[in-house]
């Protein structure tokens, strides 16, 4: 993980929308750095998807976030959805 990085945000979003998107990015960071509660993570992802409904835009934001932070939105969402556990974290193999 990089120490300081920028979040990919769309300046046309409202303050509330930016807050929701940042909250989801924070959940992804938490997934990689410690652990997340599955329900909270998925609620945050669903709020993110209401703001970013386009798969193409989601992939672009995910690529930009990964280039900036080193964290993959795609893999975080995939692992959390597939997990049967209440708390989930990235496998640190």
Swiss-Prot record:
Signal peptide region: none
InterPro entries: BH2638-like_sf, UPF0223
Stated family: Belongs to the UPF0223 family.
Protein name: UPF0223 protein YfdD
Annotated organism of origin: Lactococcus lactis subsp. lactis (strain IL1403)
Gene designation per UniProt: yfdD
């Amino acid at each position: 993980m990089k120490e300081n990085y920028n979040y990919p945000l769309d300046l046309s979003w409202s303050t509330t929308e930016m807050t929701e998107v940042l909250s989801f990015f924070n959940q992804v960071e938490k997934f990689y750095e410690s652990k997340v509660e599955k329900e909270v993570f998925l609620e945050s992802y669903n709020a993110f998807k209401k703001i970013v409904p386009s798969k193409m835009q989601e992939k672009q934001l995910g690529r930009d976030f990964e280039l900036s932070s080193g964290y993959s939105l795609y893999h975080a969402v995939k692992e959390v959805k597939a997990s049967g556990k209440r708390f989930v974290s990235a496998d640190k193999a």
